[in-house]
Amino acid sequence: MRTTTPTPEEMEQYVARFEDLPANKDRTAGKIPPEAREMMTARATRTVIATVDKDTPWGNGVIPGPSNFAVVIAECEPGNGPGLHSHAHTTETFTCLQSRFVIEWGDKGEHSVKIGKFDTISVPPGVMRRFANIGDERGLLHVTLQGPLRDVEFAP
């Protein structure tokens, strides 16, 4: 197999520095009332990798990615997290980077597991799910989405 060796300057397009990632909440400012937005999603999300061939719900990623794939870091204050929702065709994988989270699933969120730093859970398509920061500090959750990026449905 033939390989390539990018220059350090060329590799910079594949580096995402957390402090430089824009908060996606700014993308919906003025379009969705802040109170409603915070019920639907994490306090802020920062897109790391996203497809370059279409606009994603989180905006373009700093690092270009393949179709139907995104990496987002969700920032949640204690008690914060999105509402119960499902993705018909998308697998969502959560890894706790900071604080502690509860991941709930089921049509009413009747099942749950708590995860701590570096613990990971992958939720398959078609399962109602939500997450919330149950720690005392700001939480960071690494979220990998694999599948159609606009197939979300919120619980009634």
Where are these regions (language model features)?
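A generic fold-level signal
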Residues: 64-68, 88, 136
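Conserved short histidine dyad/triad with adjacent acidic residue
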Residues: 52-59, 70-88
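Conserved hydrophobic/aromatic beta-strand scaffold that supports enzyme active sites
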Residues: 71-75, 93, 112, 120-122, ...
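A short, N-terminal "cap"/entry segment at the start of jelly-roll beta-barrel domains
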Residues: 1-68
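Double-stranded beta-helix
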Residues: 1-16, 128-156
